Regions:
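A charged, aromatic-enriched C-terminal amphipathic alpha-helix characteristic of glycosyltransferases
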Residues: 119-148
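Short hydrophobic beta-strand element within catalytic cores of glycosyltransferases
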Residues: 83-86, 97
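Nucleotide-activated donor-binding/catalytic signature segment of Leloir-type glycosyltransferases, i.e.
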Residues: 30-49
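Short alpha-helical donor nucleotide-sugar binding micro-motif in glycosyltransferases
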Residues: 53-58, 142
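A conserved mid-protein helix/loop that constitutes part of the nucleotide-sugar donor-binding site
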Residues: 2-16, 28-32
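Short glycine/serine-rich donor-binding loops of glycosyltransferases
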Residues: 13, 71-74, 92
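Aromatic "clamp/platform" in nucleotide-sugar-dependent glycosyltransferases that forms part
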Residues: 66
Length: 153
């Protein structure tokens, strides 16, 4: 990921939580944040296979962004069985399917509360929600819209 202002990573770093905080990625705020938060494990930019191992080893993936239009990293984490904690804003609302009870993670205006609650989300549920975004599911959705369009012309 990108360690930059718009990712709101400070919200994650300032949370008091059990365990070790891990940050993957590089960016303009990286050096300043490294010196301010020395207890955080900074892994830099990782190859996809290593990143998948980091996702799978995490108890919760914290997505502190408030301005993402989608947030593919949430799906990547959930595909590895890691529940997501996020603010209830556009990207996470769609990815976690807020209209059906936020499957695969927890949305909350208090990010620490989202984190705490996400610890209780079963890992299989996170993975199952990620599979809703597979190419096979995308194809089904596309076909569902094609048929009504053909019959109305």
């Amino acid at each position: 990921g990108r360690v930059s202002y718009e990712k709101n990573i400070k919200a994650f770093l300032e949370m008091e939580t059990p365990g070790t905080k891990v940050v993957c990625g590089v960016g303009p705020l990286e050096e300043a944040l490294k010196s301010r938060y020395p207890g955080v494990r900074w892994l830099g930019l990782l190859p996809r296979d290593e990143l998948a191992l980091v996702y799978a080893a995490a108890d919760v993936f914290v997505f502190p962004g408030r301005s993402e239009t989608f947030g593919l990293v949430m799906l990547e984490a959930m595909a590895c069985g890691t529940p997501v904690a996020a603010y209830p804003v556009d990207g996470p609302l769609e990815v976690l399917n807020a209209s059906e009870g936020a499957k695969g993670g927890v949305l909350h205006a208090d990010l620490k509360q989202a984190f705490t609650d996400a610890l209780q989300v079963p890992r299989w549920q996170a993975r199952e929600r990620a599979m809703d975004f597979s190419w096979a599911e995308a194809g089904k959705l596309f076909q569902a819209y094609l048929v009504p369009a053909r019959s109305s012309s």
